[in-house]
């Protein structure tokens, strides 16, 4: 039986909410629901109050004829799947221009023009493009220290993936490729082993083992991914990086295949 899309979404929204970055002050409600593997109207209401994530789910659902918490919708936003390819660029542009708080409409328009109107409503693209168009407008002229800080922020805030190499009580050792600045571009660095937190009380981490691939958000393992999901996350991350590097270069570079 497929997991609830509500719980899948909550797993990936949990850590930034705990850190106070996103959503209402309802982390214990989210945590309790994840531990018990149950959903209710209170959890749904809490997730609807995430000012960035929930409008993205609405956009994907509206564009593809799905319900907002159909499993495939939050999966598309956090991990990536074929639904992203069905969201018209014009819809995403209108959404970014009018609905995303904190975005300069002029910069949004310039960004979409430089990308020929092609951009996925994917969490990692949102994260990377936010820094590319607002935090780091100087692009290649950034100092080395600024580049390091931006790369670290992007790496923490995106959804990354890692292969489990060791399992502790509340920490996993994972083999991961972090984000770095390389030759003025954001890129995946060579693999390294890192420690991340996880909650063994949340399914499926009670049985996590070496060789599993997990999704990671703010140094916290969110879920164990299927082979299809890990391939999709790698695929859409590569697309996101290609597009964002065009923004950093002033729209002069084509996305990498």
Where are these regions (language model features)?
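Short solvent-exposed strand/turn elements
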Residues: 175-183, 249-252
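Structural detector for short beta-strands of small beta-barrel domains
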Residues: 152-174
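N-terminal intrinsically disordered, low-complexity, charge/repeat-rich segments that act as generic
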Residues: 1-148
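Short nucleic-acid-contacting surface segments enriched for D/E, G, S/T with interspersed K/R
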Residues: 197-215
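Short, basic/aromatic beta-hairpin or loop at an interaction surface
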Residues: 179-197
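Short peripheral tails and domain-boundary helices/loops at the edges of structured domains
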Residues: 229-257
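Short, glycine-/Ser/Thr-/acidic-enriched flexible segments
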Residues: 169, 179, 221
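Short, Lys/Arg- and Gly-enriched loop/turn segments at beta-strand edges
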Residues: 219-232
């Amino acid at each position: 039986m497929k997991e609830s899309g509500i719980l899948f979404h909550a797993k990936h929204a949990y850590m930034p909410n705990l850190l106070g970055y996103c959503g209402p002050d309802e982390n214990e409600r989210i945590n309790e629901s994840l531990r018990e593997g149950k959903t209710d109207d209170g959890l749904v209401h809490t997730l609807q109050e995430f000012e960035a994530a929930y409008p993205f789910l609405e956009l994907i659902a509206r564009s593809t004829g799905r319900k907002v918490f159909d499993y495939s919708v939050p999966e598309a936003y956090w991990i990536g799947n074929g639904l992203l390819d069905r969201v018209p660029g014009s819809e995403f542009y209108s959404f970014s221009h009018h609905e995303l708080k904190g975005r300069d409409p002029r910069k949004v328009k310039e960004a979409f023009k430089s990308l020929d109107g092609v951009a996925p409503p994917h969490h990692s693209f949102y994260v990377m493009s936010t820094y590319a168009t607002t935090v780091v407008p100087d692009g290649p002229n950034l100092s080395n220290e600024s580049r390091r800080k931006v790369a670290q922020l992007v790496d923490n805030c995106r959804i990354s993936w890692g292969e489990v190499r060791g399992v502790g009580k509340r920490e996993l050792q994972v083999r991961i490729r972090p984000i770095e600045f390389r030759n003025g571009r954001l890129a995946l660095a060579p693999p390294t082993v890192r420690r991340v937190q996880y909650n063994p009380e949340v399914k499926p981490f009670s049985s996590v083992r070496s060789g599993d691939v997990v999704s990671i958000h703010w140094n916290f393992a969110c879920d164990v991914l299927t082979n299809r999901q890990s391939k999709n996350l790698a695929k859409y991350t590569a697309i996101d990086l290609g597009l964002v590097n065009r923004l950093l270069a002033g729209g002069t570079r084509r996305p990498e295949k």
